[in-house]
UniProtKB/Swiss-Prot annotation:
Annotated Basic and acidic residues bias: 83-103
CDD domains for this protein: NTP-PPase_HisIE_like
Name assigned to this protein: Phosphoribosyl-ATP pyrophosphatase
Gene: hisE
Swiss-Prot/TrEMBL catalytic activity: 1-(5-phospho-beta-D-ribosyl)-ATP + H2O = 1-(5-phospho-beta-D-ribosyl)-5'-AMP + diphosphate + H(+)
Organismal lineage: Bacteria, Bacillati, Bacillota, Bacilli, Bacillales
Enzyme Commission code: 3.6.1.31
Recorded family membership: Belongs to the PRA-PH family.
One GO cellular component term: cytoplasm
Amino acid sequence: MLNDLYEEIKKRKEQPKEGSYTNYLFEKGLDKILKKVGEETTEVIIASKNNNQELVNEVADLTYHLLVLLAEKNVSLSSVQAELERREGKLSTTRDRKEIDEL
């Protein structure tokens, strides 16, 4: 499903469709796309404190906007998948991570 959505987003970038929200984002450029990613991230955080359906809706919105960002930056979804696979099964300890307050 994510692959299909990503391919459709790339198609819209290459073959714009009038009135398309995806094309609107591409036309406005990287700053607008980043603003939407930030807004949706905040909405995920807020929804996490509310109810699960709201959380699902906001995560779907964030996922879509992240895919638009990847397409804008010409980063393939398969490269993200490969990175996740590379990390699969690796153990990490709290010693390997920065304290959240330090981020």
